[in-house]
């Protein structure tokens, strides 16, 4: 960020901190970062919509008045959700026109001056929590960052919403720029790529558009699945991909599904997406969820007991955003009610979220039924002592999913599968986990069954 804006913010924080409790300051203000300043307003990045709502309702005037006390000028305060910075052109567009553009594009992030790349400073390899669910994707991303266009090109990362795909993409960009400040790195969402193409066609600036995206060393495109069905965008990206790949430039793509499952994607693009390495990120297991919560608490300087984090990790399983959001919600609830953070308080704070999730409770019998139907077996076959491959492998998949999708203990899972020992369950879980890293057919099978279980 601009040096003057940095000094202004530091002095502002000192005033704000004196007007708030330590818990409230750490919860709401500490994670905020000023993005830009114009003649009339200051834009401030906030981590999520919940924090933005609280700041708008309770602390906006305090921040504005504190800034006025520092610089003797009253600015309009605009809180902007961090994730929106990637989807909207907040960093490159001023409030008025080109006159203020330079002021409003300042931010404390590593970017190449020649490009309009936007990388989140918080998304680095150091801040990424590694677990069984993302270890392969992390290793692949680091390998690409260490040797762009020499390891895997393209790198295609896929997984559900909020599992860390964008984090890894930004981390790759940061790592490359830190080791080569002259590298031209561009990160963009597929939606923004499409919108810029539309504007380029409308304004007859096709060559400028092509120069921007083809004259780079590293191109990172998030949510590439959204170009499916857009013929002109696919045509343009096909040629962009070819030119970059032929020039030995690195391409990194992310999606919510593997290339072969993206509908209405042209075959020529699908095949190119599969040229390099495809790495998936799965829903984090309990141990990884705990590690994520501890990391978040450390970064935000939050004091939360292990039993409370254990409660959150048990109840919130879907994705990292919800997990971290639940922690912030609990801290906020504690701050607003002036109560200590306990499991009981956590239960109160998350009751609405938990009640919605419990409406879709997954059981081992439901998993067994769906797996049995999928493989044309009977549930009794999964519980039997038969060891033929046509029974044993589906049984291992069912055990794996029982471990992933339920709260049942290993002994309980073993009991549900014909009274098997918990070590058998561990073996099944580890075998399927390992095979998922390289077996695309198994990846499709597990994904398909998981969807059926969630819809059941």
From Swiss-Prot:
GO terms for cellular component: cytoplasm; plasma membrane. ATP binds at residues 162, 164-166. Oligomerizes as a right-handed, spiral filament on DNA at oriC. Pfam families: Bac_DnaA, Bac_DnaA_C, DnaA_N. Its main location: cytoplasm. The keyword ATP-binding applies. InterPro entries: AAA+_ATPase, Chromosome_initiator_DnaA, Chromosome_initiator_DnaA-like, Chromosome_initiator_DnaA_CS, DnaA_C, DnaA_dom, DnaA_N_dom, DnaA_N_sf. Keywords: ATP-binding, Cytoplasm, DNA replication, DNA-binding, Lipid-binding, Nucleotide-binding. Residues 1-85 are annotated as: Domain I, interacts with DnaA modulators. The keyword Cytoplasm applies. GO terms for biological process: DNA replication initiation; regulation of DNA replication. HAMAP family: DnaA_bact. Residues 118-334 are annotated as: Domain III, AAA+ region. GO terms for molecular function: ATP binding; ATP hydrolysis activity; DNA replication origin binding; lipid binding. Residues 85-117 are annotated as: Domain II. It comes from Clostridium botulinum (strain Eklund 17B / Type B). This is Chromosomal replication initiator protein DnaA. Belongs to the DnaA family. It is found in: Cytoplasm.
């Amino acid at each position: 960020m601009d040096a003057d804006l940095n000094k202004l913010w530091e002095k502002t924080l000192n005033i704000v901190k004196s007007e708030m409790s330590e818990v409230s300051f750490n919860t709401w203000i500490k994670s905020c970062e000023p993005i830009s300043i114009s003649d009339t307003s200051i834009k401030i990045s906030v981590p999520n919509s919940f924090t933005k709502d609280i700041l708008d309702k309770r602390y906006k005037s305090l921040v504005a008045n504190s800034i006025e006390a520092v610089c003797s000028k009253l600015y309009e305060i605009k809180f902007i959700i961090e994730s929106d910075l990637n989807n909207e052109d907040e960093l490159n567009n001023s409030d008025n026109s080109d006159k203020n553009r330079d002021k409003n594009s300042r931010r404390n992030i590593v970017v190449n001056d020649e490009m309009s790349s936007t990388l989140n400073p918080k998304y680095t390899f150091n801040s990424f929590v590694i677990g069984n669910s993302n270890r392969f994707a992390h290793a692949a991303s680091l390998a690409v960052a260490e040797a762009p266009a020499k390891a895997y090109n393209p790198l295609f990362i896929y997984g559900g919403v909020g599992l860390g795909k964008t984090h890894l993409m930004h981390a790759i960009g940061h790592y490359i720029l830190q080791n080569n400040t002259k590298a031209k790195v561009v990160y963009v969402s597929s939606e923004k790529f499409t919108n810029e193409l539309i504007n380029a066609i409308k304004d007859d600036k096709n060559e400028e558009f092509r120069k921007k995206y083809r004259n780079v060393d590293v191109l990172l495109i998030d949510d590439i699945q959204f170009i499916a069905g857009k013929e002109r965008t696919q045509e343009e990206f096909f040629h962009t991909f070819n030119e970059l790949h032929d020039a030995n430039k690195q391409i990194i793509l992310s999606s919510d599904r593997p290339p072969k499952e993206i509908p209405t994607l042209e075959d020529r693009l699908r095949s190119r997406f599969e040229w390099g390495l495809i790495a998936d990120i799965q829903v984090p297991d309990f141990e990884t969820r705990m590690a994520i919560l501890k990391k978040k608490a450390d970064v935000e300087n939050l004091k939360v007991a292990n039993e409370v984090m254990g409660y959150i990790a048990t109840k919130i399983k879907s994705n990292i955003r919800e997990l971290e959001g639940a922690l912030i919600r609990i801290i906020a609830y504690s701050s607003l009610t002036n109560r200590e953070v306990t499991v009981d308080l956590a239960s109160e704070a998350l009751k609405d979220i938990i009640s919605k999730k419990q409406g879709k409770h997954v059981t081992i019998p439901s998993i067994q039924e769906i797996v049995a139907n999928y493989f044309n077996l009977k549930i009794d076959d999964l519980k039997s002592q038969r060891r033929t491959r046509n029974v044993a492998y589906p049984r291992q998949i069912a055990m794996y999913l029982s471990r992933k999708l339920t709260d049942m203990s290993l002994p309980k899972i073993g009991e549900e599968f014909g009274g098997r020992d918990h070590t058998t369950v561990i073996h099944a879980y580890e075998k399927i986990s390992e095979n998922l890293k390289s077996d695309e057919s198994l990846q499709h099978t597990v994904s398909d069954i998981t969807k059926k279980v969630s819809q059941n």
